[in-house]
């Protein structure tokens, strides 16, 4: 007889809580938001503590590996560079092999990103292409899709420039 009484007690308490929430939705909303904020604050504190207390390990610097393809490079023709696509695609073998981090306590974090002169040259070409594209967009080249006949005396705005 004790089990049905507990079930009825749970049901009546649940109904009483539901009736209280329906009668006071503002207090329920306030408690809910306070709970969410407290949880986020607690998570942030634990994250900061775990980051600050994490042991600092020295990164191992692997022995520099020579790429067997680098010794058999053919000289590139300058005309071929112009025909290339604006994006340089890297294959699975062209990934960066080693990143060396210096962990000086007061100094800045320096990263050696490029492991060969070929990768450095490739990155410089890509950066130059991106700079040229940004400059083209900045100067506001006219949009050719909107250049139809507008009739006499009409004005049109193409891209960022105003044409009369």
UniProtKB/Swiss-Prot annotation:
Q: Which InterPro entries match?
A: EVA1_A/B, EVA1_dom
Listed Acidic residues bias regions:
74-85
In this UniProt entry, the residues modified to Phosphothreonine are: 86, 149, 157
Q: Is the keyword Endoplasmic reticulum assigned to this protein?
A: no
Q: Which domain of life is it from?
A: Eukaryota
Give the record's membrane topology.
Answer: Single-pass membrane protein
Q: Where is this region: Disordered?
A: 56-110
Keywords in alphabetical order: Membrane, Phosphoprotein, Transmembrane, Transmembrane helix
Name by which UniProt lists this protein? Protein eva-1 homolog B
Gene designation: Eva1b
